[in-house]
């Protein structure tokens, strides 16, 4: 299986939506832009947000198996994907790419 690199590319926060719709929460996202993890054998890397993993898992597993070219040419690099976590108030965009043959 291939190793898959997961990189946080962009993190945004919609303060207007948070003020209007969200109840205050004690802990928010710790992910920083540029932070990266390596998935081995299609498994969730230590330290990656479990909720973010839920949105990217199928893509990471497919890339680890050597698959790619999602949605018939969606990405310039067919062995990659751009996935966002499901937090509508402070989403993080992750670039996922197969990096090595094991």
Language model features: what each stretch is:
Residues 3-7, 93-95:
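Beta-strand secondary-structure signal
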Residues 10-12, 100:
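Beta-strand elements of well-folded, non-transmembrane domains
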Residues 19-43:
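Short, flexible N-terminal segments of the mature chain
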Residues 58-102:
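Short, compact, well-ordered microdomains
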Residues 2, 13-22:
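Short, structured beta-strand/loop micro-motifs enriched in basic residues and often containing a Trp
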Residues 13, 41-47:
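Short, charged beta-turn/beta-strand-edge "cap" motif at the junction between a beta-strand
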Residues 1-5, 30-33, 101:
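A short, structured loop/turn motif at beta-sheet edges
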Residues 34, 46-64:
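Short, conserved turn/kink motifs that form compact alpha/beta structural patches or helix kinks used as
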